[in-house]
Amino acid sequence: MADFDQELDASGLNCPLPILRAKKTLNAMSSGQVLHVIATDPGSVKDFDAFAKQTGNELMESKEEGGKFHFLIKKS
């Protein structure tokens, strides 16, 4: 996993809550900073891909590890 500036643990939350929390966190971050999101909802894989495309942010990494999904999102 690459370096990141902030981490959001959305484990146990069902969509759309991980997306909404990520959006709120990203809004407080500066352009170019990276957010690491941890989620347990399998639907979050598609959701974060679509979220990045809709918002213009870059989904740098998306992987599953130990039953958790990890996303690195770079704020545009």
UniProtKB/Swiss-Prot annotation:
Keywords: Cytoplasm, Disulfide bond. The keyword Cytoplasm applies. GO terms for biological process: sulfur compound metabolic process. Pathway: Energy metabolism; sulfur metabolism. The active site is at C15. InterPro entries: TusA-like (IPR001455), TusA-like_sf (IPR036868). It is found in: Cytoplasm. One of its GO terms (cellular component) is cytoplasm. Disruption phenotype: A mutant strain lacking rhd_2599, tusA and dsrE2, although not viable in liquid culture, is clearly sulfur oxidation negative upon growth on solid media containing sulfide, and shows massive accumulation of intercellular sulfur globules. Mostly a monomer, a small portion forms homodimer via intermolecular disulfide bonds. Tightly interacts with DsrEFH. This is Sulfur carrier protein TusA. It comes from Allochromatium vinosum (strain ATCC 17899 / DSM 180 / NBRC 103801 / NCIMB 10441 / D).
